[in-house]
Amino acid sequence: MTASTKVRVAVTQHEPVWLDLHATVDKTCRLIAEAAGNGAQLITFPECWLPGYPAWIWCRPVDMGLFTTYLKNSLSYDSEHMRRICNAAAQHKITVVLGLSERDGNSLYIGQCTIDSTGKIVMRRRKMKPTHMERTVFGESSGRSLLNVVDLPIGKVGALACWEHIQPLLKYHTMIQGEEIHVSAWPVLHPHMGGESLWGMSQEGGTGASQVYALESASFVLLTTAVLGPTCVKKMNLSPPWDTLGGGASAVIAPDGRRLTEPLPANEEGFVYADLDLDMILTCRHFVDACGHYSRPDLLWLGVDTREKTQHRPEGQADNAAYGLDVPSGLVEEEGA
């Protein structure tokens, strides 16, 4: 844990410039500067903030024109756009947890990364399993994405996206890395409308999952959402219920599950600020430490394979490595070798 027990955070509740990478990067840098100017040491962004969540996928199964536009406006790590964001973090000496549609070649992934206050990318991951219609746009991750918690001067910061918060094994692996501040990234979250719509995709469901995560992990949870306005409805030709305006539900949740912040209006852009007292984590984990004294590893334990599985492997490695099995000594190069 950081030597200082007080951390000021800025949780965004803003609207991206939909399907416009350059303009959304401009806005990202402005928000970084504003948050730092208000004393924040950490700023968080929602799922697929860059270039906005592809909400049309829930309205129709295929839209090749929009997909092509979306691909061309998704963010590559090795790009001037990413360098601008990293430079903004360094200039303003603030940690950034970013949500992005990650472009790797001609494939897309729901990505998250942490940029430290020197501008270095210290964590990058992909959503383990895109949810339902998301699979028409995004690919899956591999083992490296399980390493989603990083130790920073402000504390141990981790991140998951959307319905990863109902994946018990993934959650436990995140918690067991010693997480203290957790970024819970979502797109927009509207109040449940009744009928056949899934409660778990609603504001109540997303907020509830984030509060349960706080309880289970005894960590601070920064629930981060976007705002959906009429420009998005028009650009993506959205139909009910996805044409509903608003969707902002950003919040800061304490390690015991309570909300620490008042909500902004759902259709209003702004920051949710909070000053975290990390000593509260110690108090909560004294009662419940699910990765320590409140566990039974003699009876229940989690197996994990954090190796990255690539599309091309040297002869002799392919069969075993593809399934996460051990390979003969000397056949696997150490990462970075």
Swiss-Prot record:
The keyword Hydrolase applies. Its EC number is 3.5.5.1, 3.5.5.5. Optimum pH is 7.0-9.5. It catalyses: a nitrile + 2 H2O = a carboxylate + NH4(+); 4-chlorophenylacetonitrile + 2 H2O = 4-chlorophenylacetate + NH4(+). The keyword tRNA-binding does not apply. Optimum temperature is 38 degrees Celsius. SUPFAM superfamilies: Carbon-nitrogen hydrolase. The active site is at E47 (proton acceptor), K127, C162 (nucleophile). Keywords: Hydrolase. Residues 7-278 form the CN hydrolase domain. GO terms for molecular function: arylacetonitrilase activity; hydro-lyase activity. Residues 311-337 are annotated as: Disordered. It comes from the Eukaryota. Gene3D superfamilies: Carbon-nitrogen hydrolase (3.60.110.10). InterPro entries: C-N_Hydrolase, C-N_Hydrolase_sf, Nitrilase/CN_hydratase_CS, Nitrilases_CHs. Pfam families: CN_hydrolase. Nitrilase that hydrolyzes preferentially phenylacetonitrile, but also (R,S)-mandelonitrile, and 2-phenylpropionitrile. Belongs to the carbon-nitrogen hydrolase superfamily. Nitrilase family. This is Arylacetonitrilase. It comes from Aspergillus niger (strain ATCC MYA-4892 / CBS 513.88 / FGSC A1513). The lineage of its organism: Eukaryota, Fungi, Dikarya, Ascomycota, Pezizomycotina.
